[in-house]
């Protein structure tokens, strides 16, 4: 938590079920709360990448428990962009970007490369991104690992001057 708060990137290798997501969500939420006091414009400040949609879906439910199920009353907003969303949900995310975007590596790649208006605006809403989290980092091996490494570089180049990268394994 102290590394993330200091703007340092890190990899965390805890045991299964040890609450590793708190090691990145606490500094992300802290940053979002502080940043929103200075700049109230809605934008995505953190992207969390999961290797499987099931993990993103599970984490979405945990965030609802932690931050509140009613989007109108949450101090920090979050949304999922995994390809399972309806056009209406994607349009809503385009118009009202979440502070925290949950996705998978393939959808993040598509967001960066597709030329449709929704995807372009979702990415534009993440300019100035502070955090990029890769959950279950050990699952990206071989060619897929090289693809994800390139994706991290592309995200940094497109969205962030001072990106904090966090990996859990």
Residue ranges and their predicted role:
Residues 1-169:
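N-terminal helicase ATP-binding lobe
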């Amino acid at each position: 938590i102290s590394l993330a708060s200091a703007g340092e990137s890190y990899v965390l290798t805890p045991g299964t079920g040890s609450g590793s997501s708190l090691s990145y969500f606490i500094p992300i939420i802290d940053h979002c709360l502080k940043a929103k006091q200075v700049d109230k414009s809605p934008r995505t400040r953190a992207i969390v990448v999961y290797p499987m949609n099931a993990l993103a879906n599970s984490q979405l439910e945990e965030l609802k428990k932690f931050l509140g199920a009613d989007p109108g009353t949450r101090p920090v907003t979050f949304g999922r962009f995994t390809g399972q969303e309806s056009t209406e949900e994607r349009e809503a995310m385009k118009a009202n970007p979440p502070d925290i975007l949950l996705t998978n590596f393939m959808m993040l790649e598509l967001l960066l490369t597709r030329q449709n208006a929704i995807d372009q605006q979702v990415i534009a809403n993440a300019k100035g991104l502070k955090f990029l989290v890769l959950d279950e980092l050990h699952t990206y091996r071989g060619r897929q690992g090289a693809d994800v490494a390139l994706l991290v570089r592309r995200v940094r180049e497109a969205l962030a001057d001072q990106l904090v990268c966090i990996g859990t394994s």
